[in-house]
A protein has these predicted regions:
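Short helix/turn-capping signatures at newly exposed starts of structured segments
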Residues: 1-141
Length: 141
């Protein structure tokens, strides 16, 4: 897949949600494994794309995290005022919460907005987008 940027509920650049991480390990990356009580999570950082990829136990990509750049339909989302995103996607978030983070040793109350119908989570501080997470929406049967 030769795309650039975010395709909602599908991909970022050539990283496709649901595909196996082994398809991308030729790219310059680092890997970390987090062993939690109930699950193990593998996280990869890809230097050239400047993204984090989180995978299921079987190596399938479940989440893509963009914090330095995230193009959507030619618009840079990182740094974009949140209201402009709402005007662009024409969807309101399903959920909102405030999460306290330490960033460079200083505290930030970031607003986290979930757009569950399109597989998007947006972290906002001072009304500007700081981080975008992309995930595949799984239809419940």
């Amino acid at each position: 897949m030769d795309t650039k940027g975010l395709i909602l509920n599908t991909a970022y650049n050539d990283f496709i949600l649901g595909s196996n991480i082994s398809n991308y390990l030729y790219k310059n990356h680092t890997k970390e494994v987090y062993n939690e009580l109930t699950f193990t999570n593998s996280s990869y950082y890809f230097y050239d794309d400047e993204i984090n990829i989180w995978c299921d136990d079987d190596g399938k990509i479940n989440t893509i995290r963009c914090a330095s750049s995230c193009l959507y339909q030619g618009v840079e989302l990182i740094g974009l005022p949140f209201q402009e995103l709402l005007s662009t996607i024409h969807i309101l978030p399903n959920n909102h919460e405030r999460i306290y983070l330490l960033v460079n040793g200083r505290g930030q109350n970031q607003h986290v907005y979930d757009f569950e119908t399109i597989g998007l989570q947006v972290w906002v501080w001072r009304q500007k987008i700081k981080t975008v997470l992309i995930y595949k929406v799984v239809e419940e049967t």
